[in-house]
């Protein structure tokens, strides 16, 4: 991955420009899409039709040159394509008007393909009991703002607290963990970022370095199968920013990560009975990203 392929780089640039210009031109929400030119909506790893008609399923597409770059290290081969994603929209009803209203207020999230359900709310008064509810949206709207929203000047002595919840796609992998990605504008005018592991499946404990051990791996590459014997079908947590500085503009978004499952290349190798080169990944960890919640100092 290249630095500016991450949405957080644009989000951080937005904070910096807002400090300079008084407006944030990169205050955007997140959605996922197929990014394909085939008119095919399929995004499943076992049903990947490629990005255009020249790379539809066939035994050699994994080694086709999709984009030839002057510098060979930036040339994109067929196996480097990723199957598309979906847009999740929290609309009040299933109408064109309500869906576009939700998109306008950025109450949206992206997935890399699975149909996960993800909720993300920020506020000043959430507590641990709120993470025990079966209706996170009810407490989220009552005490905070949803994904895409804004938190204004912090009450004295308080740090922003978030409710984040995710439910797995019933046809996909269990959930590995939920992370919150934070970006902020430092005192020196430069932007910074940090990724926090907030809640996870299984009996794991962060190490001395603060990093959470991997969830494990049940993928059988030869058969292109996996088992949901690790991870969790749903996760929910209440999290407070431990590094909050009320004077610094910031954004927060949630990232939900699945356990490892077979990548489209594994399905293709099985389907056509072929062997790909050793550098071709056969596994993936699907994920979802919410629109951010922004904090603006008074």
How would you name each of these model-derived features?
Residues 1-298:
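C-terminal functional module detector
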């Amino acid at each position: 991955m290249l630095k500016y392929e991450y949405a957080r780089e644009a989000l951080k640039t937005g904070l910096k420009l807002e400090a300079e210009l008084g407006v944030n031109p990169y205050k955007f929400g997140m959605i996922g899409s197929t990014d394909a030119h085939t008119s095919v909506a399929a995004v499943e790893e076992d049903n990947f039709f490629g990005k255009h008609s020249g790379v539809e399923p066939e035994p050699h597409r994994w080694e086709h040159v999709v984009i030839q770059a002057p510098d060979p290290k930036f040339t994109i081969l067929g196996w480097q394509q990723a199957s598309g994603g979906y847009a999740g929209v929290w609309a009040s009803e299933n109408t064109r008007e309500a869906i576009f209203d939700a998109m306008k207020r950025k109450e949206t999230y992206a997935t890399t393909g699975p149909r996960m359900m993800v909720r993300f709310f920020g506020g000043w008064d959430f507590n641990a009991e709120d993470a025990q509810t079966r209706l996170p949206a009810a407490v989220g709207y009552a005490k905070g703002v949803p994904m895409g929203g804004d938190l204004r000047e912090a009450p004295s002595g308080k740090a922003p607290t978030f409710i984040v919840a995710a439910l797995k796609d019933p046809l996909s992998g269990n959930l590995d963990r939920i992370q919150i990605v934070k970006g902020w504008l430092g005192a020196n005018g430069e932007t910074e970022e940090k990724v926090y592991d907030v809640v996870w499946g299984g009996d794991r404990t962060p190490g001395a370095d603060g990093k959470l051990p991997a969830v494990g791996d049940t993928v059988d590459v030869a058969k292109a199968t996996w088992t949901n014997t690790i991870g969790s079908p749903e996760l929910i947590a209440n999290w407070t920013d431990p590094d909050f500085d009320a004077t610094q503009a910031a954004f927060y978004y949630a990232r939900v990560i699945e356990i490892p499952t077979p990548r489209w290349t594994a399905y293709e190798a099985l389907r056509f009975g072929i062997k790909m080169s050793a550098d071709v990944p056969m596994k993936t960890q699907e994920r979802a990203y919410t629109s951010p919640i922004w904090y603006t100092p008074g």
